[in-house]
């Protein structure tokens, strides 16, 4: 007989790359926070596993939203701890809103609108496939794509951030997008 907690924990694991991308986007935009996104995602998943019995959602979208809330709390705790301040609920809420915006940017990267529950389910599956495919790219390509397409930075800004020429960044993005297409087609 299958242990339902194991299958739920495995289900949580499929969101690791998605959460990692969201955490990286938030950490990059927060000047005052210097931390590793992988550590924060690990803490988020540990908290989620501990709270699985209390999760009442039924869809992947509800699971993703619940995990974003846990991630927002982890980031708020990190900001609080690093700033040695008392807990600021407005900051936690603004982090949660920023995470929702980051999630929207990832979803918007996949063109199209959601008009039915089945379309939303397909979209959520595509977002997970995209984040898994992004995670498998070489780091330089992944960084260039995230900065340019998800953070909407110009090629010049990305080239400064990555300390590469604009032509080199354009090449990274072109090769990365080509590889993303291959990976996404292979995963269907």
Placement of each model-derived feature along the sequence:
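Hydrophobic/aromatic residues within well-ordered alpha-helical segments
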Residues: 11-19, 67, 71, 137, ...
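Structural recognition of an alpha-helix C-terminal capping motif at a helix-to-coil junction
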Residues: 35, 39-46, 61-73, 171
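Short alpha-helix-to-loop micro-motif enriched in aromatics/charged/Gly
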Residues: 52-61
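DNA-recognition helix of helix-turn-helix
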Residues: 130-131, 139-141, 147-150, 155-186
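Short, charged helix-capping/linker segments at alpha-helix termini
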Residues: 2-14, 21-43, 58, 165-166, ...
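Arg/Lys-rich amphipathic alpha helix in sigma70-family domain 2
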Residues: 54, 69-94, 98-101, 123
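Short amphipathic alpha-helical interface segments enriched in basic and hydrophobic/aromatic residues
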Residues: 20, 24-28, 45-53, 72-84, ...
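Amphipathic alpha-helical segment used for protein-protein interaction
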Residues: 19, 100, 104-146, 153, ...
């Amino acid at each position: 007989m299958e242990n339902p907690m194991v299958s739920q924990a495995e289900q949580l694991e499929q969101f690791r790359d998605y959460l990692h991308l969201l955490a990286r986007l938030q950490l990059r935009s927060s000047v005052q926070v210097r931390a590793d996104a992988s550590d924060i995602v690990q803490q988020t998943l540990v908290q989620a596993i501990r709270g699985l019995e209390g999760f009442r959602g039924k869809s992947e979208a509800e699971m993703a939203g619940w995990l974003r809330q846990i991630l927002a709390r982890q980031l708020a705790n990190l900001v609080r701890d690093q700033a040695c301040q008392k807990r600021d609920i407005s900051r936690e809420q603004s982090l949660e809103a920023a995470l929702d915006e980051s999630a929207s940017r990832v979803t918007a990267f996949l063109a199209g609108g959601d008009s039915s529950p089945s379309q939303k389910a397909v979209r959520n599956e595509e977002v997970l496939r995209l984040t898994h495919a992004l995670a498998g790219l070489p780091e330089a390509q992944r960084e260039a794509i995230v900065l340019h397409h998800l953070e909407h930075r110009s090629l010049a800004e990305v080239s400064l951030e990555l300390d590469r020429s604009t032509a080199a960044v354009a090449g990274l993005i072109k090769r990365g997008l080509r590889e993303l297409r291959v990976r996404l087609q292979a995963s269907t």
